[in-house]
């Protein structure tokens, strides 16, 4: 995991920059939490799909009928899961940044 952590952090930053170009900072903690929750739900969905495809792959392996199509699905869904996890991290950073920005403007 350490071999790619720095790369993932860069991808989180890239996702955050893209989101910030398209959408304003969170207006409240409630809004930020709702967006993070939505991203977590999407990540959970992809994880459930990974589990399903792996179970089918494992069933095929145990029956000696091959499991490549299911393993290809595991690969695809795992990549989707990684993207969703990056979005969760980016929105968590946006939450932090939004709160700091609101605190700064309240002090003025």
List the predicted regions and their residue ranges.
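Flexible "arm" and connector segments at domain edges
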Residues: 1-108
């Amino acid at each position: 995991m350490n071999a790619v952590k720095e790369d993932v952090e860069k991808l989180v930053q890239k996702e955050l920059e893209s989101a910030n170009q398209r959408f304003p900072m969170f207006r409240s903690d409630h809004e930020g939490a709702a967006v993070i929750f939505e991203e977590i739900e999407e990540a959970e969905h992809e994880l459930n799909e990974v589990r399903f495809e792996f179970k089918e792959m494992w069933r095929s392996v145990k029956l000696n009928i091959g499991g490549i199509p299911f393993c290809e699905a595991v690969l695809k869904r795992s990549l989707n899961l990684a993207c969703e996890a990056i979005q969760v991290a980016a929105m968590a950073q946006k939450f932090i940044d939004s709160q700091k920005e609101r605190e700064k403007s309240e002090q003025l």
